[in-house]
Amino acid sequence: VCWVGSIIFFSFFVAPVVFKTLEREKAGELVGIIFPRYYMIGYVCGVLVLVALLLTGPETAGLKWCAWGIMMLGTVCAGLAVNPKARILKEKLKDAPETEKPDLEARFKTLHSLSVKLNATVLFAGLWLLWLTAVIFKV
């Protein structure tokens, strides 16, 4: 619940407000500062979910393992691969000559798009995990 809640809160409340309130560059810097903490929440929650799944036993875990795996894979890919690469591109953009900026911006947009897709995948897998948990408790 915390993991899914943090994704919803950041994606639908924090990020939009920051980008609406601050100029684009400052908003990007602020969100860039938040991202490592955001992904850390995912890592910690992922470990806690793993422990919970191990404690529930295989007979009740079932598809929850799949949902958890998708969530972890998406979080780890975004947090340890996509986000650092995007951060490096943002730094390069600051000092890049005007002739190089369009290429760097296009590469950043590609990484941003991938990050958004990974985030959405983690969110939907998390909702699926919550649904699976609710169905099992209902029985």
Label each residue range with its predicted role.
Residues V1-V139:
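Polytopic transmembrane helical bundles with strong interfacial aromatic enrichment
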